Amino acid sequence: MTTGKIVQIIGAVVDVEFPQGSVPRVYDALNVVDAKERLVLEVQQQIGGGVVRAIVMGSSDGLRRGLTVENTGAPITVPVGTKTLGRIMNVLGDAIDECGEIGAEEHYSIHRAAPSYEEQANSTELLETGVKVIDLICPFAKGGKIGLFGGAGVGKTVNMMELINNIALQHSGLSVFAGVGERTREGNDFYFEMQEAGVVNIEHPEESKVAMVYGQMNEPPGNRLRVALTGLTMAERFRDEGRDVLLFIDNIYRYTLAGTEVSALLGRMPSAVGYQPTLAEEMGVLQERITSTRSGSITSVQAVYVPADDLTDPSPATTFAHLDATVVLNRNIASMGLYPAIDPLDSTSRQLDPLVVGQEHYDIARNVQSTLQRYKELKDIIAILGMDELSEEDKQVVSRARKIEKFLTQPYHVAEVFTGDPGIYVSLKDTLAGFKGLLAGDYDDVPEQAFMYCGRIEDALENAKKL
């Protein structure tokens, strides 16, 4: 094991000099020998003259020039397998839940090749979420990649928590949650919610169904850049065992942002909007590994923060290309008090195809979208001239569209503590029956207020009796 000396420290970036004949490879992990706590560096560049430039996987406070650094000769490895279940780990796979060592028998490198083309398998099996607007407009595929796009405060994390509640709790497989650069409070809440739901069992961790990896907002950019790979590595191990895995990443934008910080510290020339020049490649390396093989599947749900609500920003735009379904959250819908604030006109799914979902589902979804689109076009006319100037046909479209908008709302289980309304899981069959009746005009005489925050169409009819 060769050793070197720290020669320069610039924030989260450290230069280390090694003997000419034993320079570490890119992505090799280096250990700082004299550090008070375990401190790992990851090699990013070979500058020349035996000097390598590395990013710190932790705080660089207290580092100084001349400290001895050991080359491990291998990339960062993290514990994998059933011992990780029910535990909270950091980017290096160390336990941070004060429940003792992980004690895993196997460790995998966080840098791994994506499965080859021959190994990959695709599936058209649908994954029911119990959320009406998602199951109708942008259905998820088992083994697919789903993105939740939204600006600040429109409900990405709440929607993700509801999906975890509805899918992970009904789902017999295992889940991995990677908290990438998000609030520590949310990670804490999630941990205790999972305990209450019985998904995390502290007394018998082996009975737990979720492994958690956190690299939160207050951590250095190196941690936030690599924590997604740590979570993914654990999910890959479960997949290779032949299991169906759910991988939740909150938030993929922070992964990009950490890459931007590291890129600037490494002295690379920024590209569009100040992002790193390697943005597409870094995103591709992560996303290509999130895939299903013949042995098992990884279904991933990724929250994507949209800066300034601009979907054309390079970070969300780069993410779009890799996804099978996109759930777009809209601030205008949220401002009207309609939750979940999912935009049925912007959200898409490759599964919304008559050959996959069936002709009836496809027709209902497209008719809902065309009704809402026509209402959107008529809004300007209504604002200027009022409803009276519309034709009878358009008045009917507006009336039905407003009912559809209200019927797309639904109370969430995870929001029960804030709203006081019990959450509702709506089956796809009930969802299709409700919207089919609305489009056919079966409920034209029911007041639109009855459709707010109800589950099935029968609930709306019950509400109408109380109005």
Curated annotation (Swiss-Prot):
Purpose: Produces ATP from ADP in the presence of a proton gradient across the membrane. The catalytic sites are hosted primarily by the beta subunits.
Subunit structure: F-type ATPases have 2 components, CF(1) - the catalytic core - and CF(0) - the membrane proton channel. CF(1) has five subunits: alpha(3), beta(3), gamma(1), delta(1), epsilon(1). CF(0) has three main subunits: a(1), b(2) and c(9-12). The alpha and beta chains form an alternating ring which encloses part of the gamma chain. CF(1) is attached to CF(0) by a central stalk formed by the gamma and epsilon chains, while a peripheral stalk is formed by the delta and b chains.
Gene3D superfamilies assigned: 2.40.10.170, Bovine Mitochondrial F1-atpase, Atp Synthase Beta Chain, Chain D, domain 3 (1.10.1140.10), P-loop containing nucleotide triphosphate hydrolases (3.40.50.300)
Location of the protein in the cell: Cell inner membrane
Binding site for ATP: 150-157
Keyword flag Membrane: yes
InterPro entries membership: AAA+_ATPase, ATP-synt_VA_C, ATP_synth_F1_bsu, ATPase_a/bsu_AS, ATPase_alpha/beta_chains, ATPase_F1/V1/A1_a/bsu_N, ATPase_F1/V1/A1_a/bsu_N_sf, ATPase_F1/V1/A1_a/bsu_nucl-bd
NCBIfam families, per the entry: atpD
Identification of the protein by name: ATP synthase subunit beta
Primary enzyme class: translocase
One Pfam family it belongs to: ATP-synt_ab
GO cellular component term of the entry, any: plasma membrane
Reaction(s) catalysed (UniProt annotation): ATP + H2O + 4 H(+)(in) = ADP + phosphate + 5 H(+)(out)
Provenance organism: Aliivibrio salmonicida (strain LFI1238) (Vibrio salmonicida (strain LFI1238))
Gene (name only): atpD
Keywords: ATP synthesis, ATP-binding, Cell inner membrane, Cell membrane, CF(1), Hydrogen ion transport, Ion transport, Membrane, Nucleotide-binding, Translocase, Transport
